[in-house]
Amino acid sequence: AEPPDASIELIVYAAASMTETLQEIAGLYAEAAPNVTLTFNFDSSGTLKTQIQEGADCDLFISAGQKQMDQLDIASSPEVNTEGLDFVDTDSRVDLLENRVVLVVPDGNPKDIQSFDDMAAGLSDGSILMAMGNSDVPVGQYTQKILRYYGLDEDALPPSGVLSYGTNVKEVTTQVSEQSVDCGVVYCTDAFSAGLTGVDSATAEMCGPVIY
């Protein structure tokens, strides 16, 4: 066994929405365990899942969605883990925390969007531009559920272009912060970190629980 003060590196793959939180935790953890170096790779959970699948070194995976974790877990149903991947120690899995999906607007809220109802109406008539995550990342998948809740077909929305996409939640918050869009759907934690105004929160009925 290694001596208790031996240098250890832990490679942590974590959803982009965990960036600020984990960096703060790392600073505190360094005081408690100075011999441990935490090396982070932050990106969308879908991208991280692919990197792990392709053999990248990873000691800990924190996914913003259960789907990406299930796809790497041999104990998951074959309907989810369609490739029979075995990259996760099933017994080590824990539900770590819960987040919320919120609707955010840029400074001044020029389109006066106050709720998901307003968002749905604006998307239906093509009067707003909304940022959302790609379909392969959890925040995008939660947004798709919200669209379906309102009976909106993502592919059938006005061809003028009412949707703008981001490869992870940070790209979505950036689009809103830069006022490139009229609103965006992100996690509560990212809205707080980016100083964005959240005007509404999605219920579990709208998009299900957001479990990491």
Language-model features, listed with the residues they occupy:
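Exported/periplasmic ABC-transporter solute-binding proteins
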Residues: 2-33, 37, 41, 46, ...
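Intrinsically disordered, low-complexity segments enriched in polar/charged residues with Gly/Pro
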Residues: 89-90, 202
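Periplasmic-binding protein-like
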Residues: 59-63
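Short acidic (Asp/Glu) patches
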Residues: 82-89
